[in-house]
């Protein structure tokens, strides 16, 4: 038996392993970009959460900010707004679901379930009409002291609940919380 015959199997095995390794590396290099493109882009990640300074917002004033490409209405409500919102019975509402991402999904659309704080002073919601996506007019507009969508005539009350018109749902409440007394985090 010659020395060459002893090593013939090992050379062949080496070629198999080298080919398999090169194939695995090539497959990984081809698959990696396909998997990586499913991750959110840097601009989307940067907008996943924003902080809004509300220290200069007086009672009765609305602040509109852009979040994830859509308007967010932040209103510091007056005592009259709060009383008006709390006087509404659930039976008077078109949509009795609170649509508040901060509480249970099936919560009722009471005024307390729609506001950011216990006192009911701060209302934060998406500023997009639930009918066809127009931006409602704020500043105590419409028949119910809240917002009015001029596109098709939807009226929202002082808690952003649909009261009249073709819109099927209340204006939704995004994930939001107070970080401190003057800063709200969205997202």
Swiss-Prot record:
Q: What does this protein do?
A: Component of the ubiquinol-cytochrome c reductase complex (complex III or cytochrome b-c1 complex), which is a respiratory chain that generates an electrochemical potential coupled to ATP synthesis.
Catalysis: reaction(s): a quinol + 2 Fe(III)-[cytochrome c](out) = a quinone + 2 Fe(II)-[cytochrome c](out) + 2 H(+)(out)
Residues reported in the UniProt entry to bind [2Fe-2S] cluster: 129, 131, 149, 152
Q: Which residues form the Rieske domain?
A: 89-185
The cofactor note reads: Binds 1 [2Fe-2S] cluster per subunit.
Q: What UniProt keywords are attached to this protein's entry?
A: 2Fe-2S, Cell membrane, Disulfide bond, Electron transport, Iron, Iron-sulfur, Membrane, Metal-binding, Translocase, Transmembrane, Transmembrane helix, Transport
Protein name as it appears in the record: Ubiquinol-cytochrome c reductase iron-sulfur subunit
Which Gene3D superfamilies would you find in this protein's record? Rieske [2Fe-2S] iron-sulphur domain, Single helix bin
Family membership, please give it: Belongs to the Rieske iron-sulfur protein family.
Q: What else is known?
A: The Rieske protein is a high potential 2Fe-2S protein.
Q: Which compartments is it annotated to reside in?
A: Cell membrane
How is this protein situated with respect to the membrane? Single-pass membrane protein
Q: Which NCBIfam families match?
A: Rieske_proteo (TIGR01416), TAT_signal_seq (TIGR01409)
Q: Name one Pfam family in it.
A: UCR_Fe-S_N
Segments traversing the membrane: 15-35
Q: What CDD domains does the annotation carry?
A: Rieske_cytochrome_bc1 (cd03470)
Q: Which organism is it from?
A: Cereibacter sphaeroides (Rhodobacter sphaeroides)
Entry annotated with the keyword Iron-sulfur? yes
Q: What subunit structure does UniProt give? A: The main subunits of complex b-c1 are: cytochrome b, cytochrome c1 and the Rieske protein.
**EC number, UniProt record:** 7.1.1.8
Q: Which domain of life is it from?
A: Bacteria
The molecular function terms of the Gene Ontology recorded here are: 2 iron, 2 sulfur cluster binding; metal ion binding; ubiquinol-cytochrome-c reductase activity
Q: What class of enzyme is it?
A: translocase
The record, for PANTHER family, names: CYTOCHROME B-C1 COMPLEX SUBUNIT RIESKE, MITOCHONDRIAL
- Taken from the UniProt record, the cysteine pairs bridged by disulfide bonds within this chain are 134-151
Cofactor(s) the protein requires to work: [2Fe-2S] cluster
Name of the gene this protein is made from = petA
């Amino acid at each position: 038996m010659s020395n060459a015959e002893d090593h013939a199997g090992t050379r062949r095995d080496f070629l198999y392993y080298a080919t398999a390794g090169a194939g695995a590396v090539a497959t990984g290099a081809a698959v990696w970009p396909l998997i990586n493109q499913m991750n959110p882009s840097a601009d989307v990640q940067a907008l996943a959460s924003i902080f809004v300074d509300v220290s200069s917002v007086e009672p009765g004033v609305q602040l509109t900010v852009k979040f994830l490409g859509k308007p967010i209405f932040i209103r510091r409500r007056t005592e009259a707004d709060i009383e008006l919102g709390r006087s509404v019975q659930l039976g008077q509402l078109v949509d009795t679901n609170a649509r508040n991402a901060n509480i249970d999904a099936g919560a009722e659309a009471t005024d307390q379930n729609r506001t950011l704080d216990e006192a009911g002073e701060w209302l934060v919601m998406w500023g997009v009409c639930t009918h066809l996506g127009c931006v409602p007019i704020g500043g105590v507009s419409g028949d119910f002291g809240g917002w009015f969508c001029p596109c098709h005539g939807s009226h929202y009350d002082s808690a952003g609940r649909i009261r009249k018109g073709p819109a099927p749902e209340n204006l939704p409440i995004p994930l939001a919380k107070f970080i401190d007394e003057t800063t709200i985090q969205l997202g």
